[in-house]
Amino acid sequence: MRPNNRDTILRAAEKLILQHGVGALTLEDVASAAHMSKGGVFYHFKTKDELVHQLLVFAFANFEASVDSMAQDDTEPGGWLRAYVRATFDISAITETESLASAALIAAYFGKDSAVQKVYENAHGRWSQRARNDGITPATADVIRMATDGLWLAEALGASRFSRDRKREFVAQLLELSRHESA
């Protein structure tokens, strides 16, 4: 299926954020990167803040769809949480571009834009609730989810010192922990 104009604009904005950072993002540059007129971009997004807000909504919706898809095959206690861990670190589930763009947006706008902060808080509230109701102890669910989020953010911000092998071990340990802590 061919992406619609709105999705094309959002993908173009993701790429620009990766290339130049959030601070350099302009609607004019997004229009150029999306191969459409400025008016076409303004039809969907009146301001840069609105674009950023919708980009986070878009990224989180794609991520949640990946988690839900992966969780369908794992009906044991902790299955949704294992899907969350896998989707966070599986390049086929969420692209590195989406992951890095989301982190950049969160870092740049968190605390500055209450609408963006609300999107982030709502998503994390949903994920926390699902993790805590996934059939393993709530404390273990919190540890796994927060460790997953912490490594994702460290990687997205370039602060992770894990080798590829160490990352695999870390993820395997989180997955294993989710299998032995039934509520």
Question: Model segments located where?
Answer:
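N-terminal intrinsically disordered/low-complexity leader segments
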Residues: 1-4, 183
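Hydrophobic alpha-helical connector segments
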Residues: 54, 61, 65-102
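Hydrophobic/aromatic-rich alpha-helical bundle segments in the mid-to-C-terminal region
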Residues: 96, 114-121, 125-183
